[in-house]
Amino acid sequence: MSVVTLRSERPRLSDVAPTPPVFERCDGVCEVRFARRDGVSSLVHLFQRAPCRVLFPNVPADDLPLAALLTTSGGLAGGDRARISVGVENGAQAVVTTQAAEKIYRSLGPDTRVDIALTVGADAWLEWLPQETILFDRARLTRRTTAEIEPGGRLLATEMIAFGRAAHGERMSAGLLHDRWSIRAAGRLVWVDALRLDGDIAARLDAPAGFDGATAVATAIYVGADAPTLLPLARAL
């Protein structure tokens, strides 16, 4: 009788390729819509999915309804996604803001993606006034904002971006910011804007032909039939 001994072919730990860590990412959704009923603007639709959430602070009875958006995670990181939809139906009025500044944390590779859709019905009024977005060093943010405004509708929107937390002595030196706006009024494209900063962002912030040392940027947008009459006021700001 012969005896055969089989050699074990177990792989050694040194032969196993390391697996990159997989982090759980979020996909938040927020939908808010206001309508005018019996002469009063009020909430008619709300949908929210973590980490997006909507608060409704108490306001005086004669004031516009107010919604405050927030992310319960305290901010967004690489690979996270948030989709926000805000609408005011015909004749309605509303103010939508955020509870605090939105923080975009450092990414290990993937982009943070944010999609914002604003709709303003005929003869309606929407104030979209979020607090600033703070970009941490090596954050990667891709954001798209679209607005559709029906005839007679008006939109006041602001956007503020801070390249780091200046009060903490922090500054964004590298990463990605790809921010796009598109606004249509009465079916006509009236404003498009795109900002893309990639790679060595510090150099672009310091460039005299770029941001000339600024660490924050802000934009205010007003769309309405009476916009030309407000130009002197805007230029005086």
Language-model regions, residue ranges each:
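Short, solvent-exposed aromatic-acidic interface loops
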Residues: 99-104, 132-134, 160-163, 195-200
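A structural signal for small-residue-enriched, beta-sheet-centric alpha/beta enzyme cores
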Residues: 161-237
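Short, intrinsically disordered/low-complexity patches at protein termini
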Residues: 101, 119-120, 150-152, 166, ...
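Broad gene-expression machinery/nucleic-acid interaction feature
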Residues: 27-31, 81-83, 113-115, 142-144, ...
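N-terminal, charged/glycine-rich beta-strand/loop interface patches
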Residues: 2-132, 137, 144
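Acidic (Asp/Glu-rich), glycine- and aromatic
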Residues: 136-144, 149-174
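Feature marks extracellular polysaccharide-active and adherence modules
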Residues: 89, 121, 148-150, 158, ...
